[in-house]
Structure formats: structure tokens, C-alpha cells
Amino acid sequence: MSYRSKQASISRFFKSTKSNNSAKNEPAVQHIPKKTGVMLKFSYNNKENVVEGGKDTEGPHIVGSHVELPGQSVNSVVNSDSIVVNSNLEIDPKISSVLKRKPDIDIQLKTTKKRSKTLTPLEKQIRELRESHKDKVLVIQIGYKYKMFGDDAKLGSKILDIMYIRGGDDGTRDEFSYCSFPDFKLHINLKRLLTHGLKIGVVKQLESAIVKTVEKSSKSSDLMKREITGVYTRGTYMGDEYVQSSGNSADTESPYYIICINEINQKELSMVAVQPKTGDIVQDTFKDGLNRDELETRLMYLNPSEVIVLSSEQPSVETLKTIRLVASDVQLLPRKRKGEDEVFNGLIEFFDSIDNGKYKHLGDYFSVNFSKHIQSCFYELINYLSEFKLSNVFTIPDNISNFTNSRKYMVLPNNTLYALEIFQNYTNPASQKGTLIWLLNHTRTRFGNRLLNKWVSKPLIEKEKIEERLLAIEDLTGDFNNVVDALKIQLDKMGKSLDLEELLMKTHYAATYNLDKINRRDIYNMLDCFQSVLESMNRFEKGITEFSKTKKSPLLTNILLELSEMSKTTVVSNLLNKINRSYVMNESKDPEEQVTQFFNLDNHNWEDIRSEFSELDKIEKLFEEELLNIRRVLKRPQLQYITNNKEPYLIEVRNGKQVDELPTDFHRINGTTTVSRFRSERTAQLYIKKQYHKEKLLVNCNVAFNDFLKEIDEQYEFFSKIVKNLSVFDCLLSLTAASLASKNTRPILVDQQLIEVQKGRNPIIESLHNRNDYVPNDIDICYDNKVLIITGPNMGGKSSYVKQVALLVIMSQIGCYIPCDRATLGVFDSIFIRMGASDNILKGNSTFMNEMLECSNIIHGISNKSLVILDEIGRGTGTSDGIALAYSILRYLIESPLRPLVLFITHYPSLHVLEDSFPTVVTNYHMGFQQIHKDDNDFPEIIFLYNLVKGVINNSYGLNVAKLAGLPVSVISGAHRVSESLKYKVEIQQKEQFTMKFGSILQMLKKDEINSNNILELENLFSYI
């Protein structure tokens, strides 16, 4: 009995009494879900396992509802003791005797008998594949399943929570232990594996059994050809490339960057980052200190999944520590830097080789426009991405941008991002609620969402560009406009499910490397979406012209005019005319039919596809002729072919006499207790021939589809321009929505460095809490009032106030209205914030060291257009040293010729003397409060007013915070007594010091011994008084 016959015999013994099949008492052979409780229990290597149905063709695997091992009879696995069947299933009586008789090969699964060490052809193939790709976890297609072997299987079974089946016990079989899953779950499981930082290689069967049989390219017993068709990491995975789309082409995860860092020396680094999903490329060269704050800022922005570090010998410890600190789960790849000649020649050779020299000119472009250090990064990334077939991302130079551009935008440092919680809520990292991006993000599309993140992270510093966005918001908040509304509708139709930017990049990769990187329905949806946008703009051509004349915003007008101009072309319509829309849109069609019926053959001549359709039509006619012949032979003029269990062209006859009278060349395919189904010899031959031509048709359709992708990719620049305009429009709509969310006001921008705000509100706190309860505050920082020293009780609102100032500045320079009654603002080129207390164990820094390093970076980074916010400088060390450092740092900023605007929060009231020394620059403020004295309390209770008041206070009222925190009354009372005692001692010491100072100066005055030193002491005494 053949392998296939044995498989059919065992499968047929399952028969469901609840079957809905038309034939009475017909056994149901099907994959049974877990919930039905149908299981097959077996023991393998002293381990009991329960498995479910599936179907494979080679290797140790599960077939139907049984387990099959290579070299064993199917009957040896199935016996009456190893079947556990649900009550709604019964065993076919016809084969019950097969289950009871002794197996053909008597093998017990619990045996300790050693197998032969001779490897099967499949095992040899698996070993060769794994030996050739030791750096990857391999997922190998075998029949209708994907399997992982050896150590890969141990890892996979644990991550995927699937059964791990051990190999034999001959000492060499552990490498063939495996776990498996159905082929349709490939991309579901790939995503789960990739989240653990693995590098996955997908090995696919590249041959069809029917094509091999018909063309006789090899013996039928030969193995299927298997090769790696895709390699993936978390940053290079592009989504469900091989799976027919369900209408949601977008992944919910944010795309990752892959970064190459080139350590030029200890203080200078170059960097190139690429985001394969979107094609975004960022490059930068920057100076950095040993603390690597600049590198940390870039890593926080880019969120890398893989980081390549180039160096002459070994990467510096400082760089490696910083990478691990910011991205603990990143894949770190140290590399030795290549020589300049190798890099130059490598870039030239790469661009020459892509797409038959189409991008040859880019070799010179990269060598001329980028430094040697940046070129090294490009070359290393090209080599790295080549394995993933993504290196052609560098053939689109328009996607390359600078990380920093001091003339266009500011880059918020990592401390500022952290302190203001721009992108991440550090109280609840799982949610963005409470962040600035959460407040501003009302985008409709995924590509708009990505652009808004860039806008928020890099506020503009060109007044004219900020005004352009503010004018656009003003126009969008005006009267209803048909053109604007039509474009809004187009964005809403795309939503977050259709990512045009990602689909364009998938098309680019697939067109260059002939890969299944994108499915047909997504291509149609993408083109249809572009067409819908352009048709909409074409309909409102007159309205767009009128809009451009009546509205103020050049930014909004340019978007509409450019889209209107593009709508006059036939680029998209010509491509869409080649698609058979009815088949693409009908989701009920078979996936195979979606491939073969994708093109509209009436509008384009695909000769190879036409010829295969012609052959299939001929075969269908031959089937009909054979049916007429069978009718005559069987004397059944109404006889029709039937399809059963996906087996077509079957002749069904009743068991008994009708079966006995069939010609000898009729082959039984399947049956029940009452009927049997056959194919005639001629029908069987035609069926094989039809399968062959269907396979050839699929191949030809895939070739034609790849040519079609190349046509689309030729228009990449055209489509990319549409996406960029739509993304800017989406961001403007988002900022408009944020501006209208509360009583926001358009800021007035001026050339002077000042912040004058009437009744300003912290936008985050206001959004999270009841707006009616919020206490607004004025802000007045200008040339004559550049430094604000802010004191006040703990929890009085000092930090919220200074954060409010920074957030209002950032919002205004993003181009958004801000929450206040009126605002006049200068344009800042940097915002530095030192706030909070934390150590950094990974970098080996204490809390105070971190504080001082951050202060050092601020002092060295300020300009005359900087906003500096310092919170409680000096608290990480002793009081005297803390006060001294806080005083010196603040005085340095005051006296600096750059003279930035400074907000300085402190609990050191003695710093108020700086207002006396610099009355035209420094002003003391405190957060308002009220004291309530009660008879039963040793100390007053505090009511916070949360308003900014001029003046200084000498008490932080920490005991009130302790009370709010729930410390025992006895502890707080004890602390109050100690506090009062310390205050008394300090006052006594101060009086004694004053008496001594005053007495000595009085003696000098009596003796008339006044000199410059005495005068200085006298000034100090008066200041002290």
C-alpha cells in the first residue's frame, strides 16, 4: 500500500454522526478544532502528548488526526489503545479490523530501541539548511506546515506555546526534535517570534509536485527543493507579504529604525538611520561628551531595533552603555570600520548592480554629497539590508534628511523630552495619555501620524514657517469649504488601515527584487485611493482656484493647487485600467482566482497568461467530452461530475453491483458506506494536465504582476508627492482640532526674546482635569525680566508652572494655538530642562553626578535664543555645597553675554539676594498659598492657591506634604519639634555672627581703618541684614 493510500485509509475511519454532508452516513474527514475535545493521545520518547489535526507530506509530522514518523507504517502508530474519540464520533466498521490487527511494523512509541543513524533525504536537507544559516532561527515549510528543528524548536515552542516533539534516542536525533504550526499562521507566529529580537529565516518549498510530475524534471521520489525566501528581524519585517489582505494592510506597531553609528573618535560620531517600512533615512554628524547625551537624544527619537556600531577596534564603553540604557532590547552589532577605498568602491558597485544599472548615477551622488564617515554608515547598512532584500531603500535620495538643521528647527534634548513627557507618559509607560503628542494627535492616517510626530519633536525656528502653519489653521477654522471637506473625506476613507507610504515602499522592494512583498488587493486599494483623491481634486478645480484667491495660507493653497495639477494626468487611470476590478473587490473569490483573474486581459496583451487560459479552456472541453463517453459506458444520460472534499471531476456510484460493473480503468478516489467515487483513466489524466496548466498560469500571472509593480515603481516620485501633500494636510487638520479643543488663542510672534502670556494654562493638566477648576497664570519674561527665581511650598505648583511655559513655547513653534487669553512670544532655538532626581547605574553616575552633567551640558549648549528651566539645583549634595553650586550656576547664566531666559525653581530662599544684585534682570516669585492655624496643631495647615505671586518665602512647608502622604501624626509632630529647635539654633548662630561682624566693623570705623576690603565686608554685612 502506498503512502498516500495508507494516509487515506486511516483518515477515513473518522466519521461524524452530526455531519451535514448530503450523503447519508458519510464519514467526515476534517480538521477538528480544540473546542470539540477531539484529541489523539500518544507517547513519544517517554512523553505523553496530545495533538490536533493537520496534514504534511514529509518528515515526522501529524497527518489528519494521527502521527506519522518517517520509515514507519501508518498502522504502526494507530491502534485501539491510542485513540481518544469524542462521543459524537464513531469508528468506521469497515476499517475497525485494521485497527485491531498487528501493525505491519511493530514499533512502540515508548520503546527505548535505538533508531538507525542513517538520515533520510529530508533530514539531510534540514541539516544542510541549518548548517548554512547558523545565525538564523529557521522556519521550514514541509507540506502544509512550517516546522522548527533542534534548538530553534525549543525556542519556538516556548515563545509560541506549541508542542515540542523530541527526536529519537540514538544520540543524533535531538537536532530533529521539532515544533510545527499550519502554513496560514506563518505571519502571525513570525510577529511573535520577532518581538523577542530573533533573526528569522523562512524556508519555502519552491517546487510543485504536479509540475515535477508532468515535466518529469526529477524523479517523483526526489525531495522538494527548499530555499530561504525571506529573512526577517523586528526592524525589517514588512507585514503579511504572502498573505491575501483582509483589508487592513497596516501594522499597529510603530516602524523601527535600523541605525549605523560610526565612532570617528571619542568626542565625534556620525550616524545614519533607516526605517525600512517607510523609506525614511536620517543622517547626522555630531560632537558628544563622555556621557553621550547627544547620542541618547537621537536614540530616543529614532527608537531603533538594531544598531550597528563601527569603530577602528572596539566600540567605546560609553557608547555601548548609552545604547543599552535607551534601548535595552536592541540588537547590538559591533563592526570594524572598512577602509575608505573599500567603502567608495562598494557604493559604486552597489548602485551599478541595482536594476540593470538604473541607479548608476547615485554612486557619484553619495560620494560627493556625504562625508567619508557618513558614507561608511551607508555602506554598512547596504551590506546589512542586502540579506533582507531591502538595500534598494537607498535608491531614493529624496528620502534622506538631516537629523539636525539649526536654520529650520530645534531638536529637543532627551532631558526635555523626558521632563515634559512629549511622547511617553513615564508614570504609565503603556499609555500615551497625558503626553503632548496625545493632546495634539488628531490625525486621520498613519502617514499623517508619523509626520506629526516629527513636527512635535522638532519645533520650527523660522518665524515665517510657523506663521504659515498658523495661517493654515486660521483658514481651516473659517467657514465651511467644499474643497477642504472633500479632502477630509478622502483621508477618512483611508483611515489607519491603508498606509500609502508603506505600500509604496513595499512596491519598491518587490519591483526591484521580484519578491512577494505586497499582495494584489493592497496594490489595487492603493491605486484606487490615489485615483479617488485626484478625481476629487479634479471635480473641485474651480473651487481650488477660488480658495487660492480668498484664503491667506500659502501652505494650504500650495497643497490643493499641486494635487489639482496632478489630477490632470492619466498615470493612475492607466494603471487601474489593467486591473480586473470586479475580481479584486469580490472577497468571496478563491485566493488563487484573485491571482489569475487580477488583470483585465481586454486592456492589455499578456500573451503568456492568455495561452494558459486557452489551454485550460481546451481541457474543460475535453472533460465534457469524457463525461459524454462515461454516460454512454454507464448508461446514465443524466450523470454529472461532482466535487467532494475538494476533489473535483468525480463519478459517484452506489456500492455493490454498480461498482462491480465499472470498467477496470476507473480509479476509486473516496467513498462512504453507501457510495463510492471514481475517476476514469482519461479523467485522471486530464485532471493532472489541468493542475499543471493552473500552476503554469499562476507562475505567468506572478511574472506579469511583478512587471506591473515595476510600472508603478517608475512613478514612485509622482505617488510620493501625493502622500507628502496629504500627510501635511492631515497634520494641519490635527493641529486645527487641537486648537479648537479648548479656548486656545493664536500666538503673536515677535523677533525679541520674550514670553508674555495672559491667563495661560498648562495644556496637559487642563485636558486631564476639570477645566473650570484650573487656575490660570500670567507669564512675563522679557529683556528686563529675563530670570525668574521661583520658591514656594512643596506641591504648590512650581513644576507645573514652568512646564506650562515650556509647553506653550513648543506648541506655538509647532504652529498650534495655545491655551491662554493672549500671548506674545519670541522664537526660541533651544529649550533646556533640568528637572527631577535620578541616578544612572548603567552609566555609573550618582544622582548628583547626573545633575551636574546635565547642568554642564546646558551651560555649554545655550544660545541667546534659549529657554532654560532648572528645578532644585544642588539638592543632590550637602546643603552648603548645594546652595553654593545653585548660586554659582544661576549667576553664571545671569552674567552670560548670551543671556538666555531662565526659570529657576529652588528651595534655597537665600538665592533671593540675586534680585538685589541684578534688579533689572532677576525677579523673585513664589506660588501663592494660605496658612490656617488651628489650636490642636503645632504647625499651620496650608491651602495651595496655585497662582504666581511676586516675592520670596523662606519655608517650603514640607511637613504639610508629609501629612498629605499619610505619615503618622506622631512622626510629623516630632519632625515639627526638631524643625523648630533647628530654626532656633540657626537664629542664635546668626545673631552671634551678626554681633561679631558688626562689632569688628564698628571698631574699624572708630579707628578710621577703612579700605577696599573693609568696604566689601560692610556690603556683605548689609546684604546679610
Swiss-Prot record:
InterPro entries per record? DNA_mismatch_repair_MutS-lik_N, DNA_mismatch_repair_MutS/MSH, DNA_mismatch_repair_MutS_C, DNA_mismatch_repair_MutS_core, DNA_mismatch_repair_MutS_N, DNA_mismatch_repair_MutS_sf, DNA_mmatch_repair_MutS_con_dom, MutS
According to the record, the residues making up region (Mispair-binding domain) are 114-235
Instruction: Summarize where ATP binds, as residue positions.
Output: 792-799
Q: Per the record, a Pfam family?
A: MutS_I
Q: Which GO terms describe its molecular function?
A: ATP binding; ATP-dependent DNA damage sensor activity; mismatched DNA binding
Q: Which keywords does this Swiss-Prot/TrEMBL entry list?
A: ATP-binding, DNA damage, DNA repair, DNA-binding, Nucleotide-binding, Nucleus
The subcellular localization recorded is:
Nucleus
State where composition is biased (Polar residues).
Answer: 1-24
Q: What is its main location?
A: nucleus
One GO-annotated biological process of the protein: mitotic recombination
Using the UniProt annotation, give all residue ranges assigned to the region (Disordered): 1-28
- GO CC annotation: nucleus
What is this protein's function per UniProt?
A: Component of the post-replicative DNA mismatch repair system (MMR). Heterodimerizes with MSH2 to form MutS beta, which binds to DNA mismatches thereby initiating DNA repair. MSH3 provides substrate-binding and substrate specificity to the complex. When bound, the MutS beta heterodimer bends the DNA helix and shields approximately 20 base pairs. Acts mainly to repair insertion-deletion loops (IDLs) from 2 to 13 nucleotides in size, but can also repair base-base and single insertion-deletion mismatches that occur during replication.
Its assembly, as annotated, is:
Heterodimer consisting of MSH2-MSH3 (MutS beta). Forms a ternary complex with MutL alpha (MLH1-PMS1).
The family note in this entry says: Belongs to the DNA mismatch repair MutS family. MSH3 subfamily.
The protein here is known as DNA mismatch repair protein MSH3
Q: Which organism does this sequence originate in? A: Scheffersomyces stipitis (strain ATCC 58785 / CBS 6054 / NBRC 10063 / NRRL Y-11545)
